[in-house]
């Protein structure tokens, strides 16, 4: 059963039309995670619309189309098992808020598959996603050179694309020699579950084998305790029960904890998971817990719980490294968008633009730039408009990443480099 296997969050990244959805659909179908009757139904529908090649992509259909056709695919179907792990596919880019989801919280990916279409090679979005995944701390990567059927399974073309992608990976500190580059056709299923006879020249692993040889993510249980609060309930006879997912550290019954930025604290009376009381909670556990002396007004979404002797850091201001993904004009000092970090959403002001970086190499390109635009990477000083918990990414990576949102879109992604505490 899945619970006995280590769990991995897998991001599937790459340019919008390079076949990510078909790739994920095929992976899940071949791994037995999608009932055959659903696929048959899609094949039939796709055929009628003259879009036969979309059968697998339809498995991963975006919400809008699902609603139009009155079908929904439960998120549970985005899980699949291999011999070694059970995987959850976290949102593919292109899905709404991918970047925000990737940065904040539950969908923190442990590894990524980069899908690059053989006919097109590297596109702008390919670069952006590689850089972003690096910024977000993903350090295990598998490259699928997809749509090989469209280039007649040409080894020469495969080598050209490997060359292109390796160049970018090197620039941002990945070692191409440690990364499998797998020629695939998600539509035909080549080199997904097993090696294909259409690519006799390819000697590496198929996708499944590459997934099985990923390294299990280390549980950050030795780090200080941090539990971002998702919500707080009042339960009669018990009192106030905050709920959230343990990001780092271990919490035991009887521990003295504190909720920041508010500062209310007390002793842990009980911890519950899946409606059962447990003696301690470890990273990844979704729990409800009750703290003696904590009232309804002492704790809210966005607070972070930690041990009283090592409380979460509350920033008066902090220095962040950001990548600007999109902005209609330019960003200057004084800009005050909403920052999403763990479960908090707080307006923060960019009080200084310190350095502009070369997004490919991380080298300083310009000191004290006057503005930033889409595609720029920078070091900036940020002042939250109200108290906010954030941690340097080197100390507690799970609480060091953030997304910047404005005008209904993700403007930038970033990580906290240092905190000046209140």
Curated annotation (Swiss-Prot):
GTP binds at residues 14-21, 91-95, 146-149. The gene is tuf. It comes from Methanosarcina mazei (strain ATCC BAA-159 / DSM 3647 / Goe1 / Go1 / JCM 11833 / OCM 88) (Methanosarcina frisia). Coiled coil: none annotated. GTP hydrolase that promotes the GTP-dependent binding of aminoacyl-tRNA to the A-site of ribosomes during protein biosynthesis. Pfam families: GTP-eEF1A_C (PF22594), GTP_EFTU (PF00009), GTP_EFTU_D2 (PF03144). Residues 185-187 are annotated as: G5. The keyword Hydrolase applies. Residues 91-94 are annotated as: G3. Its main location: cytoplasm. Keywords: Cytoplasm, Elongation factor, GTP-binding, Hydrolase, Magnesium, Metal-binding, Nucleotide-binding, Protein biosynthesis. HAMAP family: EF_Tu_A (MF_00118_A). Belongs to the TRAFAC class translation factor GTPase superfamily. Classic translation factor GTPase family. EF-Tu/EF-1A subfamily. Residues 70-74 are annotated as: G2. GO terms for cellular component: cytoplasm. It comes from the Archaea. Residues 14-21 are annotated as: G1. Its EC number is 3.6.5.3. It is found in: Cytoplasm. GO terms for molecular function: GTP binding; GTPase activity; translation elongation factor activity. It catalyses: GTP + H2O = GDP + phosphate + H(+). Residues 146-149 are annotated as: G4. This is Elongation factor 1-alpha. Residues 5-221 form the tr-type G domain. Mg(2+) binds at residue 21. InterPro entries: EFTu-like_2, G_TR_CS, GTP-eEF1A_C, P-loop_NTPase, Small_GTP-bd, T_Tr_GTP-bd_dom, TRAFAC_GTPase_members, Transl_B-barrel_sf.
């Amino acid at each position: 059963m899945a619970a006995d296997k280590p769990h991995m969050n897998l991001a599937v990244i790459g340019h919008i039309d390079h076949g990510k959805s078909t790739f994920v659909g095929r992976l899940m179908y071949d791994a037995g995670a999608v009932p055959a009757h659903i696929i048959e139904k899609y094949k039939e529908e796709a055929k009628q619309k003259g879009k036969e090649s979309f059968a697998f992509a339809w498995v991963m259909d975006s919400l809008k189309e699902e609603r139009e056709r009155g079908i929904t695919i439960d998120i549970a179907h985005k899980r699949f098992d291999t011999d070694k792990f059970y995987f959850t596919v976290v949102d593919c880019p292109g899905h709404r808020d991918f970047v925000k989801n990737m940065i904040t919280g539950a969908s923190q990916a442990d590894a990524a598959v980069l899908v690059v279409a053989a006919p097109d090679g590297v596109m702008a979005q390919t670069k952006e996603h590689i850089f972003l995944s690096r910024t977000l701390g993903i350090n295990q990567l598998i490259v699928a050179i997809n749509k090989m059927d469209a280039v007649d399974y040409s080894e020469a073309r495969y080598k050209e694309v490997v060359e292109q992608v390796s160049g970018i990976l090197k620039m941002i500190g990945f070692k191409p020699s440690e990364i499998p580059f797998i020629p695939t056709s998600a539509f035909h299923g080549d080199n997904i579950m097993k090696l294909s006879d259409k690519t006799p020249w390819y000697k590496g692993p198929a996708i499944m084998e590459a997934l099985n040889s990923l390294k299990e993510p280390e549980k950050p249980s030795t780090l200080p305790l941090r539990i971002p609060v998702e919500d707080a309930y009042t339960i009669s006879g018990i009192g106030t029960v905050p709920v959230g997912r343990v990001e780092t550290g271990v919490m035991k019954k009887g521990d003295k904890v504190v909720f920041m930025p508010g500062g209310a604290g007390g002793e842990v009376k009980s911890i519950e998971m899946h409606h059962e009381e447990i003696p301690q909670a470890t990273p990844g556990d979704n729990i409800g817990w009750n703290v003696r002396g904590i009232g309804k007004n002492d704790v809210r979404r966005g607070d972070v719980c930690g041990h009283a002797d090592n409380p979460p850091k509350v920033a008066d201001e902090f220095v962040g490294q950001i990548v600007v993904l999109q902005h209609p004009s330019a960003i200057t000092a004084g800009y005050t968008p909403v920052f999403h970090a763990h479960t908090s959403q707080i307006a923060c002001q960019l009080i200084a633009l310190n350095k502009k970086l070369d997004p490919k190499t991380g080298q300083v390109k310009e000191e004290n730039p006057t503005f930033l635009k889409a595609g720029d990477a920078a070091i900036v000083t940020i002042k939250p408009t109200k108290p906010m918990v954030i941690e340097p990414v080197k100390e507690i990576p799970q609480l060091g990443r953030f997304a910047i949102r404005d005008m209904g879109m993700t403007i930038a992604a970033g990580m906290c480099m240092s905190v000046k505490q209140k």
